[in-house]
Amino acid sequence: MNSSDEEKQLQLITSLKEQAIGEYEDLRAENQKTKEKCDKIRQERDEAVKKLEEFQKISHMVIEEVNFMQNHLEIEKTCRESAEALATKLNKENKTLKRISMLYMAKLGPDVITEEINIDDEDSTTDTDGAAETCVSVQCQKQIKELRDQIVSVQEEKKILAIELENLKSKLVEVIEEVNKVKQEKTVLNSEVLEQRKVLEKCNRVSMLAVEEYEEMQVNLELEKDLRKKAESFAQEMFIEQNKLKRQSHLLLQSSIPDQQLLKALDENAKLTQQLEEERIQHQQKVKELEEQLENETLHKEIHNLKQQLELLEEDKKELELKYQNSEEKARNLKHSVDELQKRVNQSENSVPPPPPPPPPLPPPPPNPIRSLMSMIRKRSHPSGSGAKKEKATQPETTEEVTDLKRQAVEEMMDRIKKGVHLRPVNQTARPKTKPESSKGCESAVDELKGILGTLNKSTSSRSLKSLDPENSETELERILRRRKVTAEADSSSPTGILATSESKSMPVLGSVSSVTKTALNKKTLEAEFNSPSPPTPEPGEGPRKLEGCTSSKVTFQPPSSIGCRKKYIDGEKQAEPVVVLDPVSTHEPQTKDQVAEKDPTQHKEDEGEIQPENKEDSIENVRETDSSNC
């Protein structure tokens, strides 16, 4: 495995070396091409510089010739001016001579003078013209012609030279542009040459590193090959010796009597095996050390490469830090602007006028009479917590609690209707007989409740609902509304009546049920049943008794010591509803509404006079509402 890995590494190194050499040769060829281009550009530049020098020399020669021509022109101008001055002098002299001749002629006769003058004039004109012509033709005309010819030739030469100068200037501009282009190309080529030099240097470094690694790997390979050969030869020798010793030991063991030589051979065999194991361990340690050295060398090289990469990354990090600082400054500026905008927004919001006051709170929600029934059921299930519930009864309930209690009460009542209610026995001896006024109200309420509970067990109750009169329902509604007004006024002054009034308001008015219960009640018969001796109460272990048809419950009032929720009826200002506890009482026979009416129809009116109407209506309303909830 090691030899195959080493061969693979050698192949990789050779391939990398060949790639580096090929890249190096390509770069060298490109460098030579760029050098040739640079030499050509230099030659062109030198030729352009030579042409520029020649043009400069020619321009200097032309300028010298132009200066010479200008000097010659100035000389000719001076000669012409001197010739003109001589001509003017000669004209003046001729005029003076004419005047003198005129003076001499004046002494002669006029005819002679006129003739002579005419002759003289003609002669003088001819003489002057001839003298001028002679003067011009002889002395100056040649010079003037020569000068004119020279001026024309000089002007032509001047024009030619001006044209040549313009051409030379345009050529100079072109040459200068070419030189600038050459310089730019030279700079570009120099930059490319520098880049290629850097690439060549990198390639040289890489090639050097590759060559060094290749040489090191070759040295390590040779060392490992030598060590492997030595180890193989040593192992083969030891294997041969071990086989010899095994044979000798086998022969000695075959012999029946062990000799001293056999013991010595065995001892030598043991020693040799120990030496073999020690040398094998040393060989393994050496191999491990060599492998660690190779790994360390590779690690050093990797560390060097990683350091170079770290330097590059640090430079990138510095650039990124600068960008980060700039972005942070921008973010701070933006935050500052955002804070200012938020302050402005807050100021604008603060400056807005305050909102109008909230509307007044809504009136308290109408309480539920089911809550009283729930409290009774809870007292039955949790008698120990009656005191805490009594303290909480004075606090006003919210709408959410009322709805929860309604739901719980309905669920519990449905469960009790389905499964049956386990009622506890009543201890009649523990009833305190104090305050006769309150006992009267309690008895009347109990009578009414018992009669209503009896009517619920009859099958004829559903039929009686259909035969109700609208007049009775209307009168019952009016009576209930009047009673509620009175109880609201009374409970506003008493702390115990707040819950009762709130509960009584939450239940909807059931006029039909109240009318049915009113027509069905016979107070005298109910009172007689209540006062009649009750059957023996069951023991706590017996449980509820099964009745034929249905079970009715007896309504009792317990003192505050046992229940903690007894209420008093006061004739004057304070009124409150009694807390009802349902106790199991086995009825002998289910009485219908007709049977109750047949017993004593005359006692209903007599009992109405004894019981106060307001307390009576409260108890009836409570029984009706509990009855409706059970339904």
Curated annotation (Swiss-Prot):
The modification N-acetylmethionine is found at residue 1. The keyword Acetylation applies. It comes from Homo sapiens. Residues 7-353 form a coiled coil. It is found in: Perikaryon; Cell projection, Axon; Cell projection, Growth cone; Cytoplasm, Cytoskeleton. The keyword Iron does not apply. Phosphorylated on Ser-101 and Ser-249 by PAK1 through a CDC42- and RAC1-dependent signaling pathway, which enhances its association with F-actin retrograde flow in filopodia and lamellipodia of axonal growth cones. Phosphorylation on Ser-101 and Ser-249 is increased by netrin-1. One of its GO terms (molecular function) is identical protein binding. The lineage of its organism: Eukaryota, Metazoa, Chordata, Craniata, Vertebrata. Residues 403-418, 590-631 have a biased composition (Basic and acidic residues). The N-terminus region is necessary for interaction with actin retrograde filament flow and accumulation in neuronal growth cones. Gene3D superfamilies: Vasodilator-stimulated phosphoprotein. Residues 456-465, 490-505, 550-561 have a biased composition (Polar residues). GO terms for biological process: actin filament bundle retrograde transport; axonogenesis; Cdc42 protein signal transduction; cytoplasmic actin-based contraction involved in cell motility; endoplasmic reticulum polarization; netrin-activated signaling pathway; neuron projection morphogenesis; positive regulation of axon extension. Belongs to the shootin family. This is Shootin-1.
